[in-house]
Amino acid sequence: MSCKKSARQSLYVSLCLFYILVFAAATEVDFYSPECHSHTYEIVLNSFSSIWLLINLFLLLCSFAIFLKYWCYKTFASETVKGY
């Protein structure tokens, strides 16, 4: 039961951090204005596309980690039983 509670708390903390990152971003600056320079342009994280990109990046990294875990375990198991 405590494992579920711990997972729920960590999910809550990560969602709070995500909310802070998304909604505490600086106000948008017109990227094409002459006063804006590309090296000083601030990335805004409260648009739909940036949130969608972050979610997709998170899912991609999780799926990559799961695949590598499976692949490494499969290789380890086949190498281990090869001697028997």
Swiss-Prot record:
Signal sequence, renumbered to the chain: 1-26
Localization: Virion membrane; Host membrane; Host Golgi apparatus, Host trans-Golgi network
UniProt cross-references to InterPro entries, sorted A to Z: Herpes_glycoprotein_N_domain, HSV_GN
Record has Disulfide bond as a keyword: yes
Superkingdom to which the source organism belongs: Viruses
Keywords from the UniProt entry: Disulfide bond, Host Golgi apparatus, Host membrane, Membrane, Signal, Transmembrane, Transmembrane helix, Viral envelope protein, Virion
Residues on Virion surface side: 27-47
UniProt key word Signal: yes
Coiled-coil positions: none
Pfam name, any one: Herpes_UL73
Membrane spanning stretches: 48-68
Membrane topology according to the record: Single-pass type I membrane protein
GO terms for cellular component: host cell Golgi apparatus; host cell membrane; membrane; viral envelope; virion membrane
Topological domain ranges for the Intravirion compartment: 69-84
Protein family according to the UniProt entry: Belongs to the herpesviridae glycoprotein N family.
Function field: Envelope glycoprotein necessary for proper maturation of gM and modulation of its membrane fusion activity. Also plays a critical role in virion morphogenesis.
Record note on quaternary structure: Interacts (via N-terminus) with gM (via N-terminus). The gM-gN heterodimer forms the gCII complex.
Name of the molecule in the record: Envelope glycoprotein N
Native source organism of the sequence: Human herpesvirus 6A (strain Uganda-1102) (HHV-6 variant A)
Lineage: Viruses, Duplodnaviria, Heunggongvirae, Peploviricota, Herviviricetes
